[in-house]
Each structure stands twice: as C-alpha cells, then as structure tokens.
C-alpha cells in the first residue's frame, strides 16, 4: 500500500478475483455520454467498425456478470434512443448544467443517483463508470475490479492504472525567470538519480472506475480516501481522429481472430 497524506493507494495484481458465488450487493453501471464534444463532434455515437462508439461500452456492461443494471446518462434525446437500441436504460435526460465541458463527474453522478433514489427508490451498493470513449476493454477487468471492492471493505474505490512512461521525479516547475524547481521533493536530488533507483509510479486511465455509492452520496467524492489500483496495460481512449483509426484497427484485428 502506498500512502500520501490522508489518501491511501493499494496496488492490485491483475489476477482473476471474481467468483460466481459472490452476488451479495447491487451493482449499477453508468455510462456518461454528453453530446457536446468539441475535439470530435458527436464522438460518443460516431460509427466505429459499424457501431456507434457508445454501443461498445453498453455491450461490455451487459456482458459483465457482476453488473445488475446498465444506464446511460445523457443530455441528448438522440443519444438516448441509440443507447436504448443497444440495451441500456435511459431513465432521465441529464440537465444541461451537468452536460457542459466544465461539468464535474461528481455532479453527473450525484444527479444520477439522486434521480434514481427519488423516482425509483433505487440505490445500488457499488457503481461502475464506463466512459464511452473506451470501446476496447476486457469484461474480466470489470469483474476483477468489482470483486476487489466487494472483498475489501477498507477500499472506497478501484481505479485503472498503468506504469508511467514519464515520471514526476524527472519533472520541473519553471518560474518567470526560467529558474527550475523540482515537482517532487520527497527524494533529495531525485532528478540526478538513475530511474531504476526511484519509486515506481503509475498513471491513471479512465477506462473503468468502480466505487461505493456512499463515496458520492456521503463523501462528495468520486474516489473516497482509500483508492485501490488495478493494473491495465492496454488503453484506447478516443479523443482525436488518430485515436479513432487506432481503435478501429484494433477492433477489426480482434474480430478477425474470432
């Protein structure tokens, strides 16, 4: 376990954790899909290998045995119809104030959970966030992350990580006079040390987030205080045209293997 002040970070080996005999709590998957993308217009419903991109995340959620319910949170009636076509529920249309490019994930999930509680008296124990910009992910990774949270009550959430290619121990701030100061100060002169002697660090991707509902409703957070890390090597986040091409090639190659 790594700790940083009040936050603790647990590293999980990428092993098969999920077991079919454990189904004791309600797990909700939420796929947030706003319509106002600026980098690539309507990227969440853009066709990739013949299907809207959001369809892949819906299919991943529906295929995961550990997920009990799948909803899409969107501000678009058009997106809602597409989501329903591929099997997701769309119990509400997200208010415009939670669909801007500055809206926080916390606002989006507080709204979704509040709506479900007030209108359906429904409150899951665990929430899985699957962003639609990741059309490639393994069902087993979703299952492993859910099961880890079920088996470890000390953890508030689980996040995907991968070893960082660029490490903060070799990074700097620079002031207006071009004077450098190191970002990391916990290791003396870390910038002069061989990389192999420095602590191993990870960056987070956003492919899968799993967290307890109470993290949002009681702690006003998307992670809580104890964050477990699940290593995932592949990461196909789509934000540019180049990303689309790479993901399409990967999906096509995977289909050809079947």
What positions do the PLM features span?
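Short, Lys/Arg-enriched N-terminal segments with co-localized hydrophobic residues
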Residues: 4, 8-21
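Hydrophobic helical membrane-anchoring modules
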Residues: 8, 19, 218, 229-231, ...
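N-terminal nucleotide-binding beta1-loop-alpha1 segment
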Residues: 22-41
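Hydrophobic targeting segments
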Residues: 26-31, 54, 69-70
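Conserved SAM-binding loop
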Residues: 46-47, 71-72, 129
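A short, N-terminal amphipathic alpha-helix
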Residues: 53-67
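Short phosphate-binding loop-to-helix
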Residues: 78-128, 137-140, 144, 189
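Conserved core of the sugar-phosphate nucleotidyltransferase
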Residues: 107, 135-232
